[in-house]
Amino acid sequence: MSSGQQQPPPPRRVTNVGSLLLTPQENESLFTFLGKKCVTMSSAVVQLYAADRNCMWSKKCSGVACLVKDNPQRSYFLRIFDIKDGKLLWEQELYNNFVYNSPRGYFHTFAGDTCQVALNFANEEEAKKFRKAVTDLLGRRQRKSEKRRDPPNGPNLPMATVDIKNPEITTNRFYGPQINNISHTKEKKKGKAKKKRLTKADIGTPSNFQHIGHVGWDPNTGFDLNNLDPELKNLFDMCGISEAQLKDRETSKVIYDFIEKTGGVEAVKNELRRQAPPPPPPSRGGPPPPPPPPHSSGPPPPPARGRGAPPPPPSRAPTAAPPPPPPSRPGVGAPPPPPNRMYPPPLPALPSSAPSGPPPPPPPLSVSGSVAPPPPPPPPPPPGPPPPPGLPSDGDHQVPTPAGSKAALLDQIREGAQLKKVEQNSRPVSCSGRDALLDQIRQGIQLKSVTDAPESTPPAPAPTSGIVGALMEVMQKRSKAIHSSDEDEDEDDDEDFEDDDEWED
């Protein structure tokens, strides 16, 4: 038995057969024009003629005719190629009941799809070989179709022995008087049979019944894109499956098997609904808006601490409103704006000595600037604008002149501009109190600038989960298997097609 099974494979393998009139290089180029998994069983240089309505032969083209076994399409074709340009000039499929005639040794005719066609061969030897290859192929196909028509158990005749098993026939043959007994037994049997008949009441309702949606998949044509379920279409789009893959016979079979293994269409739909993540993202929290108001409310409290309300500079000259923060720091300090924003907690650290009225608070603060660093937290009541308290000695000259003269205010502004230049030297001097706070603020700014770069694009591997990820993994394995297969393996696969009955359909 083993030897009998090993004999069929050798004839199945088909190799390319070139033309006798072409060089080996031209034959090799011809084989490459055939396409993947296609083999030419015979090749010859020919002229193609077609019969017009006037029953006159007209030349259509010249080239190399090939009897092609097209494994992807599972059919046989007569194809003519132009070996110079590598183009397919004409083709004719070998349909069922195809008849191949040879009125001349070099002139062969057959019925095409639209008209009568003829091949005029350049060499009679090639014409003989080509005709033999075509007729042998047609003969094999004819035998296969006949085998398919005849049932496998056709020659067996079991009916000859059936009459022996029938007791009624034997009684009729040998015993006439027993006919009455037979009729009685028949009536009894009929009565029993009537009792055993099932009614609608005896038929129970179906159990474990599940309605499984139709996937719309056909083994030969793949998925029906016109009637494809929208949810399945969405799944295929998420997985990056193209329409060509859905139409491909083998790839669509892999996808169909995956759907069946996961429980069918309904199970896939339910899984997709479970994994749907759209609801959570829309929640745009309202917390962001509330936090900003507290920051805006922060600035008002500091000025309230300075017995007056707004800082003195604006009260003296409304046009000088922007510069007040700088003059407030005649001493060594960092840029005025940052401390003003961060100052609400340390603002109470104003010196106890500030007898001057509300308008001139900035100068009095400068007088006792030397004492300011130690007691900043405890004395919130002392007057003074939010950030102005500084430690300069220049403020002593301003104490007698805080009458509100614009010249003094301009001097303070100028001094503030000088402080901006000195702030680089003042950073190392800071040791406690407001200066320490300024250093912290500066460090915080540096940290912010450092944290801008590190993180860029982490969110990528999230979507590959659940049924989508499983299907994507299956498709990746499928693509790897396709790309990793060599042409030699493809030829080995072709061996199984020689006697495949599906080609007859």
From Swiss-Prot:
SMART domains: PBD (SM00285), WH1 (SM00461), WH2 (SM00246). The modification Omega-N-methylarginine is found at R307. Gene3D superfamilies: CRIB domain, Pleckstrin-homology domain (PH domain)/Phosphotyrosine-binding domain (PTB). Phosphorylation at Ser-242, Tyr-256, Ser-484 and Ser-485 enhances actin polymerization activity. Signal peptide: none annotated. Residues 186-198 have a biased composition (Basic residues). The modification Phosphotyrosine is found at Y256. Residues 203-216 form the CRIB domain. The modification Phosphoserine is found at S242, S484, S485. Residues 276-349, 356-365, 372-391 have a biased composition (Pro residues). InterPro entries: CRIB_dom (IPR000095), CRIB_dom_sf (IPR036936), PH-like_dom_sf (IPR011993), WAS_C (IPR011026), WASPfam_EVH1 (IPR033927), WH1/EVH1_dom (IPR000697), WH2_dom (IPR003124). Binds actin and the Arp2/3 complex. Interacts with CDC42. Interacts with FCHSD1. Interacts with FCHSD2. Binds to SH3 domains of GRB2. Interacts with the C-terminal SH3 domain of DNMBP. Interacts with SNX9. Interacts with the WW domains of PRPF40A/FBP11. Interacts with PTK2/FAK1. Interacts with PACSIN1, PACSIN2 and PACSIN3. Interacts with NOSTRIN. Binds to TNK2. Interacts with SNX33. Interacts with NONO (via second RRM domain); the interaction is direct. Component of a multiprotein complex with NONO and SFPQ; associates with the complex via direct interaction with NONO. This is Actin nucleation-promoting factor WASL. It comes from Bos taurus.
